[in-house]
Amino acid sequence: SGPDIVTHHTCLYPMAGQTISASRAVEVFMAAGVPAEKLVLGAAFYGRGWSGLDSSRHPVGQTGKPGVSFRYPACAKAIAEGSQKRCWDDEAKAPYLWDGDTFVGYDDPESLYHKVSFVVSRDLAGIMFWEWSQDEDNELLTAIYETYQGHRFPR
């Protein structure tokens, strides 16, 4: 998929017909001999997306105009104000915003729960994120911390 093809930004698992995902990257590195304790999974504290999409079709897989970017607080605000609808892709374990024209993939507390659980279950070194300043209320950092509670940290 090229830069104009709509796909999830940082999905944990691939959707049907897709091959790119965080879990797949971990599998590839481990198959190449990289030890789990050397791998860190990534998360995004911002959203990335496309505009100019067809509202009659599911957004993922469409061709659109890339370049849409939201800080995490803007994602939450758009949902609260009703200008964007939060959707959940249960296969990819990824949220996205969708208004019929614009798709924005991002991470939220629910997707981070699944990512941290994956990190713990695979004994990975941990999780990283970009960019902390885009989590103004520490909602995402708190979700990561709270999910780790009760789990031991990898070596």
How would you name each of these model-derived features?
Residues S1-A78:
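Substrate-binding surface in catalytic domains of secreted glycosidases
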Residues K77, E81, F118, S133-R155:
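Aromatic-rich peripheral "rim/lid" segments of glycoside hydrolase catalytic domains that contact
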Residues A43, E131-S133:
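Active-site proximal loops enriched in glycine and acidic residues that flank catalytic Cys/His/Asp
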Residues A25-P35, K115-R122, T147-G150:
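Structured segments of extracytoplasmic/periplasmic soluble domains
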Residues L41, V119, I127:
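Conserved, mostly hydrophobic/aromatic
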Residues P66-D123:
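Hydrophobic, secondary-structure "cap" segments at the distal end of domains
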